[in-house]
């Protein structure tokens, strides 16, 4: 069993709302079809969700009726993205089953909780890849809040205990001087980040959150990598149990 989290930046251009690049998805789907291993697929929202969520101020929960319109529009945009990905994967022979994130996840002050694992387990038993995405879900204290695909990957790992989790991005892994700059860090431990912003590794914002979830997964005993979605050579090597020519492995 493998969990693959496809970052929104790997398949959309966040500077252009509702933009979608399906070519990387096609290449990945062909590889996954050929390798034939059990999967769970999770994707981010990218330019489909982020502009709407930002415009309606959903990052800190919901406080008024205007924001509830933002919840509606964000979930609709994410389902449109999911539908496009589902169709493209099916064309390449990868069967997925869409599980609406809000039907299985809840949150408390923005912290994800897998409240109803049944649909995920049932899909896996039937041999189809569950597909989820980062989304706006009901929050016991904030009304609605956003949970990331990375948080979902951590919780589903806790449920299924896969042998491998891949975070696929628009860059080849974590770099010593920020996105695409400096040396590619082939292995990364939590302690390597003590000097963030100084002379060690410069990671901030969304990547820092992604790393936190990735390390939590690695500490469960699951090998965890960050790779470019376009680096099919490395992805195939990792799935085959070999060392990839690129990518960053998270070490607990």
Label for each model-derived stretch:
Residues 2-252:
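C-terminal catalytic "cap/lid" subdomain
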